[in-house]
Structure formats: C-alpha cells, structure tokens
C-alpha cells in the first residue's frame, strides 16, 4: 500500500528505523482497542500516525481511558480529513487530507479522455485545493495531499 510505503520512507528520511512492533494492522473495534492498549503498555509512545481518521479514534479512546490528554501527553495524526472524525474529536484531529473530490474528478476526466481518445481541456477544470496531475500522467498518478494541522499534535 502507498501509505505504508510512505510511512516507511518518512521514517528512513528522518533517520529512524522501521520497527514492525510499532505497527498495528487491525480492522475492527475490539482488536484495535487491544492493540493500541498493548502499544501504550509496552512502548509508552508519545505519538501515533494512524492509517486513517477512523483508526485515530481508537487512540483517542485509549488515551482518554488512561487519563492522557491528546495534543499534550500524546500526539495523533490521521489520514483522510474525514469531517466526522477530524472535526468532532476533541481536540480536533491533525490529518493528512486526501482530496477525494479532486481524485474523483481527475479519474473521471482521465476515463473520458481514454474513451474518446482525445485530450480534455484542463483550462475548464474547477479551482481545487489540491493540484491535479496532468491527464497524460501514468496510472497510478500521484495527487498532492496537504497536512491539516489542528489540535491533536503537541507543539
């Protein structure tokens, strides 16, 4: 997965070694909460980078059960900028925004361009928050994702 490869590359670029014991690969409530609890018990981490904003909720929950304050005692970053999680968790979740609208718009334009075998006039594209790659980019194409800084990371 691209996110996992990016996580490993960011660790390496920052001079940290990848440690598989710090990675939890869980899909649902019970196992996720137990995995986060185990990390707190065994490693006492000061921060979490979560696969998505929904997974970040588990870290908030475990931190609260331990009397820890998110953004002060522990930092949490999610991925998606999913409004239900990123804006309703307290403090609000710092997150890497996936530009879903832009990704869908680009994919639809790319598909139309391929079906019609002609380029799409990109001058008529909507103004978006994330720059879109050219339609002649190879698939898979990379789209810029912005870090949306909120209150869940210690300053």
Where is each model-derived feature located?
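Bacterial carbohydrate/catabolite-sensing allosteric modules
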Residues: 1-155
């Amino acid at each position: 997965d691209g996110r996992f490869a990016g996580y490993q590359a960011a660790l390496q670029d920052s001079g940290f070694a990848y440690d598989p014991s710090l990675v939890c690969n869980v899909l649902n409530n019970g196992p996720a909460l137990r995995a986060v609890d185990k990390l707190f018990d065994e490693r006492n981490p000061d921060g979490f980078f979560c696969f998505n904003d929904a997974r970040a909720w588990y870290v908030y929950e475990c931190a609260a059960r331990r009397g820890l304050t998110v953004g002060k005692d522990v930092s949490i970053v999610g991925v998606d900028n999913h409004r239900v999680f990123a804006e309703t968790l307290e403090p609000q979740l710092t997150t890497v925004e996936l530009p879903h609208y832009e990704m869908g718009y680009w994919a639809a334009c790319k598909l139309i361009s391929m079906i019609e075998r002609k380029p799409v006039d990109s001058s008529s594209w909507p103004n978006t928050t994330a720059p879109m790659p050219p339609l002649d980019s190879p698939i898979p194409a990379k789209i810029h994702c912005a870090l949306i800084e909120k209150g869940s990371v210690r300053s």
